[in-house]
Amino acid sequence: MTDAGKTAFTSSPAYADWIFVMKTWGDGLRKAGIGKLAPGERTDRLLRSVSGSLAKAGNLEVLGRGSSRIAFRFRKDPKFALKVASNSEGLAQNEAEYANAAKAGESYSCFARVLDFDSLNGAFMACDCCPQTTPADWVRVTGLPIESVLDIVDCAVSGKVSLKEIERQCSLGWDEMSSWFAGRFPPAKLKAVAGFCRNAVSSGMLKWRVFRDMIRFYFDNGNQAMLMADMGGYANWGVLKGQAPEQDAIVIIDSGLGEGAV
């Protein structure tokens, strides 16, 4: 975690916790039968599943809910983190790293994607965070409270933009890119979004082809949202490969490509 990020993040009462944002729409949930339900029913069913499986370990607090997302707080538990890591594809070898991080009191939220998380009824779960523009950075840049992560996750481009133009903007400097993004994002969220897109692509953590395909999917399906949670998941692999420092202790659990805001 950067010094600036640590200062912003540790000043929040949520510092000792992980905050999860769980979307209730996506291929994994459709396969599990949840996607066939009405939006409110999806939320109810997933909330019951989460409560039943995670509450056994204690310290589960639901922060907010809506038609398509649930936000809840689960206090740090090294054993829980190790369990998730060991159940993740290709991550069993990282248990020692997480144990050492826990002993040192470091945040160890960047544990990539959690596949087929059994305690959530077989739904495909992806544990995402953004290693370049982190929630702590969002707090520092925007002045928003940490609880506003629900809004930040749903930052969206307001209108179709050509993929070629987005690619060009990702290669520009900060001033040029910020100017291009102006009007497409709420002003308070502008720098966080533009910074993430530019940093993720230019650093090589997020390959342009993946970024392009992701954006095309949203556009082709009539949803112009570029969700931080989805993009953060791809960038996370760079963290595990040592291409970027691990930074913060807020994790976004994303069950698939979502729609709308809470």
Please describe what each predicted stretch is:
Residues 5, 13-77:
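ATP-binding glycine-rich phosphate-binding loop
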Residues 61, 65-103:
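ATP-binding glycine-rich loop module of kinase domains
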Residues 73-74, 84, 126-129, 239:
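Conserved hydrophobic "DFG−1" position in protein kinase catalytic cores
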Residues 89-97, 136-141, 261-262:
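Active-site-adjacent loop/helix micro-motif of nuclease/hydrolase catalytic cores
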Residues 110-205:
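Conserved structural core of kinase catalytic domains
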Residues 199, 213-217:
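Extracytoplasmic/periplasmic ligand-binding sensor domains
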Residues 217-227:
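Protein kinase catalytic-loop region centered on the HRD/HxD motif
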Residues 226-262:
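Catalytic activation segment of kinase domains across protein kinase-like and atypical kinase folds
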